[in-house]
Each structure stands twice: as structure tokens, then as C-alpha cells.
A protein has these predicted regions:
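Glycine-rich, charge-decorated loop segments at or immediately adjacent to ligand/cofactor-binding or catalytic sites
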Residues: 182-189, 386-395, 497
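Cysteine-nucleophile active-site neighborhood
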Residues: 17-20, 24-28, 32, 343-439, ...
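C-terminal and late-domain segments of enzyme folds
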Residues: 442-535
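Beta-strand->loop->alpha-helix junctions that form or flank phosphate-binding loops
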Residues: 235-242, 328, 485-488
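Short beta-alpha connecting loops at secondary-structure transitions
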Residues: 57-65, 243-247, 352, 373-379, ...
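Flexible phosphate-sensing "switch/lid" loops adjacent to ATP/NTP-binding sites
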Residues: 1-323, 333-349, 356-357, 364-370, ...
Length: 535
């Protein structure tokens, strides 16, 4: 392909319709046809990154391979396409404004009055077009967060308007809207979609494709009506109905010809329709799984999206283990040594989830103690691994006040501490270990059994580390094996309790690197152990 083509995905009527899934599905379908693609997300909020947003309100903060904090939709992009994301796949209003203000302070605008148009919109356009200038992608798919009509999103839509005018048929807009069903009337209503498109048109953008999100199937007549009233070709109107699994969406979009419509609009040959054989095999295997395993997620956020990547990784691995993973949220604030048996009852395995702050910390320790003492299949992630170490120090070493410096800076036994060379750094965000780091795994351990190799690379997102200088030897003598370490610093990345069948903790976040076709080896081994234990 001579020149990069651009696909802009916008949303209307309501939020949370699944723009991220549609963007990822488009990427998957074009990738299957041999095109080199990338997907990026522009979020209208003024936070520079999602790292400071409350997971209870916004969902998880996803981490790219270079350690950038990103929206959870980037997880969908990676899980669908197997393409690793970086800081260049995620932007916010706050980040763009910050960069423009920095340029103004450096005098790069030569005394001009800095305004939303052209300076902010030009910066947005530069970010949107980076994929065509740096890495030469065939298609750059850009998702715009929020809905049409939000005041925060206007600069992004203006940038799209300008790019569509400048690029001609090299730029298309895919607009996702909601078609509500009125049960009293027994009708699907297209008027909200018409108004959403009209609002987009009033901003100078004519959508080229419409994806109609609905709970009931639309008739051909309704689809033609929408096409006619919205100035869109009939073959460019597709439906996105509720499906049992998000991984069926690319197949449904392909069946309705969304990828061929985009190719036609951008002047590319249609060619033969890809079979998507591995993907279809995964979906069928998922449908045919009969066995059900129940896994408890021990955490403090009851919003499902707060642990989105963990949910998806466990679900993917369940498919490859021919079982359906049923997840149960267990509020760690309700767990004590006295209540653990009742609160944790009935699960086949447990994940002690990552998190920050003291709320729910003691409950996680009680959960870890119960799981270890009862030889239950358990995976600790991030803070979950730190909890495992603190619990062993309290119960097995007798250090009753043992804790993490994050939770108790007065403790005399800092089992988990901030790295020594980072204690003088004033900005807490400057002390975080984020992104890809190597880990060397000791042979003969459960971690090695999971990965099958000595050196691995996983994504980290944490500030505190196991205090290896003071406590590693004692913990290992008590049975907590440090089976994976960073090769240069000696920092402990993986622990496992040798007396248990499978009780493993990782300081890194294995769920971030788990995709549909390449699931996380550690999460896979955990689900396999859970399934085998159930029989």
C-alpha cells in the first residue's frame, strides 16, 4: 500500500457501547487480510494519564510495554491483534494540552496567540498521523473516547474533520450508535441514531459507516431507513447485537462485511475473505466447554472493569483448558481470620488481586493465610504477591507487625519496601517500576513449569519490592521460595510456597500480556491447576 489510510471510530447516543471492541475488531479483520495496522485511543479527559483515576469509577489502568499508563481499551486492542502497545497508542486532552503549553513556554509558537484552533487541533492531527510518518502502517485506527456532543471531545472531532478534508478517501469515519428497544411499543427506535449522525454532520463530519448497537435484531427495512436518513451506503450499515462473548464480534462484523466496506471506501481491493481459522477455533472451543470452575477474585474494587485484564486472561485460559471460568468478586474488606472460611467458601481457586493503599490490605492477608494453610490453588498478582510475603513473615516467622512500608511506615519489619535508590525521589510516580522487565526463573520450580524457560519478560506496575536484603533468606527457610528474580538488580519477581501444591505470587502483571491466541503462561498454569484439582 502506497499511503496510510485512517479509520476514525466515534460514538453517539450513549457511552459504553463498545467502541474499543469495534476498533479492535476492525483491526483484527484488516490484519487478517495482511495489512499492517495500529490502533490508538484519544480520551477527552484532562488527566494527563489514567494513572490517577479511581479504578472504581474508570476501570483498570492498563500498562503498555514501555510503561505508559493507558485506558483499558488498549487491552482489547492487544488481546485482539497481538500487537503490543506503547505510549504512542494512547493520548488524553491533558497530555496534548501539556505538550502545547510546554512548546509555548519554549517559544516555539514565535509569539502567536495559542488557541484551540489551530494549535491544539494541529497537535492532535500530528499525533493521529504519526503512524503514517514514523512506522508506515497501512491503516491507523483511531478511537475517540466519549460521545458526540460532549464538549470535551470537540477539538478531536474538529481534527478529524480537517483530516477527512485533507486526506479524501484515505480517511473514513465509523460511527457507533445505540438503537433502543421500547418494550411497551415492541419497536426499535432509530431516531436517536439519526440525531447523533445529524450532530456529527453539524460538526462537518459525514460518517462513512454506521455500527448499530442493539439488543434486538434490526430488519433490513430499518437498516435501509437508517442508511437513507443518514446519507450512508446501505452496505456500510452493520449491526452489533449482544453476543455471549466479545470474541465473537470480529466474526459478526466480517459476516456483515464491515471490513470489505472499509476497503471499498478507501479504494483497496477486496480480495478473498480470510478464514480466521485460529480465531474461530478459539470461539468454538469456548462455546463447547462444559466444565465450570469457580474462581474467587479477592480485591477491593467491585467494578468489574477494575480487573478487566484479569477477567479476560482467566477467561481465555479457561477456554484452552476446556472449561468455563466463572468469576466471583470477594471483597477483601470483609475478610478476617475469623470470617475467612465462610467468605472464601465454595471456590475452586483464588486470585489475590493487585491494588494500592491500605483499604482491604489486612483482608487480603487473611485470605492468603487461609489459602496457604488449606493448600488451595492461589495466584497472587502485584500487591497480591506482596501480601503472600507479609503473611508468611507474620505467621511463620513470628513478626506480628510485619507489613509493607506503603501500608505502615512505622513497622519494625518492612517485608515490602521501596527500592533503596528511589527513596530520595520526591515524585511518587518517579519511583514506579512500569513496563517490560526481564525475570530469570529457577529450574525445577512451579514458575518454571508454567513458562518452560529460564528468561521471561513481563509487564510491571508497582512501586514497592520484597525486602530481599533483610528477609529473603528467612522467608525461603520458612518455605517461601523466591523462584524468579530480576537478573540485574536481584529484585524478587516471583515467589511460591513449596509446601503447597500451587501457591504462586508474581510482582508483575501477567494479565497484560495475555491475548486470545497467546494466553499468559502463568495464568494458564493457574487455571490448569484449578481445573485439574476440580477433576
Amino acid at each position: 500500500m502506497a499511503e496510510t489510510k485512517f479509520i476514525f471510530v466515534t460514538g453517539g447516543v450513549a457511552s459504553s457501547l463498545g467502541k474499543g471492541i469495534i476498533s479492535a475488531s476492525i483491526g483484527k479483520l484488516l490484519q487478517a487480510r495482511g495489512y499492517k495496522i495500529t490502533i490508538q485511543k484519544f480520551d477527552p479527559y484532562i488527566n494527563v494519564s489514567p494513572g490517577t483515576l479511581n479504578p472504581q469509577e474508570h476501570g483498570e489502568c492498563y500498562i503498555t510495554i514501555d510503561g505508559h499508563e493507558a485506558d483499558l481499551d488498549l487491552g482489547h486492542y492487544e488481546r485482539f491483534t497481538d500487537i503490543k502497545t506503547t505510549r504512542w497508542n494512547t493520548f488524553t486532552t491533558g497530555r496534548i494540552y501539556s505538550e502545547v503549553i510546554e512548546k509555548e513556554r519554549r517559544g516555539e509558537y514565535l509569539g502567536k496567540t495559542v488557541q484551540v484552533i489551530p494549535h491544539i487541533t494541529d497537535e492532535i492531527k500530528r499525533k493521529m498521523k504519526r503512524g503514517s510518518t514514523k512506522e508506515k502502517f497501512d491503516y491507523v485506527i483511531t478511537e475517540i473516547g466519549g460521545t458526540v456532543g460532549d464538549i470535551e471531545g470537540l477539538p478531536f472531532l474538529e481534527a478529524i474533520r480537517q483530516l477527512k478534508w485533507e486526506l479524501g478517501n484515505r480517511a473514513v469515519c465509523v460511527h457507533l450508535t445505540y438503537v433502543p428497544y421500547l418494550s411497551a411499543a415492541g419497536e426499535l427506535k432509530t431516531k436517536p441514531t439519526q440525531h447523533s449522525v445529524k450532530q456529527l454532520q453539524s460538526l462537518g463530519i459525514q460518517p462513512d459507516c454506521l455500527v448499530l448497537r442493539a439488543e434486538h435484531k434490526l430488519s433490513q427495512g430499518l437498516c435501509k431507513k437508517v442508511a437513507s436518513f443518514c446519507n450512508v451506503r446501505p452496505d456500510c450499515v452493520v449491526q452489533s447485537l449482544d453476543v455471549p462473548s466479545i470474541y465473537e464480534v470480529p466474526i459478526k462484523m466480517q459476516e456483515q462485511g464491515l471490513d470489505t466496506a472499509i476497503l471499498s471506501l478507501t479504494g483497496e481491493p477486496i480480495g478473498e475473505t480470510p478464514a480466521l481459522a485460529p480465531w474461530r477455533s478459539f470461539v468454538e472451543r469456548r462455546k463447547n466447554a462444559k466444565k465450570v470452575v469457580n474462581i474467587g477474585l479477592v480485591g477491593k474494587y467491585d467494578l468489574q472493569d477494575a480487573y478487566k485484564s484479569i477477567h479476560e486472561s482467566l477467561s481465555q485460559c479457561g477456554t484452552y483448558c476446556d472449561c468455563k471460568v466463572k468469576l466471583h468478586f470477594i471483597n477483601s474488606e470483609k475478610i478476617t481470620d475469623e470470617t475467612a472460611a465462610d467468605v472464601l467458601r465454595g471456590m475452586d481457586g483464588y486470585v489475590i488481586c493487585p491494588g494500592v493503599g491500605p483499604r482491604g490490605f489486612e483482608g487480603k492477608i487473611a485470605a492468603a493465610k487461609y489459602c496457604r494453610e488449606n493448600n488451595l490453588v492461589t495466584l497472587g498478582i502485584g500487591l497480591g504477591m506482596q501480601v503472600m510475603a507479609v503473611e508468611c513473615a507474620r505467621t511463620l516467622l513470628g513478626y506480628t507487625d510485619a507489613s509493607s512500608y506503603e501500608m505502615d511506615d512505622k513497622t519494625t519489619h518492612r517485608i515490602v519496601d521501596i527500592m533503596e535508590d528511589l527513596k530520595s525521589v520526591g515524585n511518587p510516580f518517579g519511583t514506579m517500576r512500569r513496563g517490560n522487565y526481564d525475570t530469570v526463573i529457577e529450574k525445577g520450580t512451579k514458575a518454571y513449569e508454567a513458562y518452560g524457560e529460564e528468561k521471561i519478560t513481563e509487564r510491571h506496575y508497582h512501586r514497592y519490592e520484597l525486602n530481599v536484603v533483610e528477609y529473603r533468606d528467612e522467608l525461603e527457610k520458612a518455605g517461601l521460595k523466591c523462584s524468579g528474580v530480576h537478573p540485574e538488580s536481584g529484585l524478587v519477581d516471583i515467589v511460591e510456597f513449596t509446601a503447597c501444591d500451587w501457591y504462586v505470587g508474581a510482582i508483575y502483571e501477567p494479565q497484560y500480556s495475555s491475548t486470545v491466541l497467546h494466553p499468559s503462561p502463568l495464568v494458564m498454569e493457574f487455571v490448569k491447576q484449578v481445573s485439574n484439582r476440580k477433576g
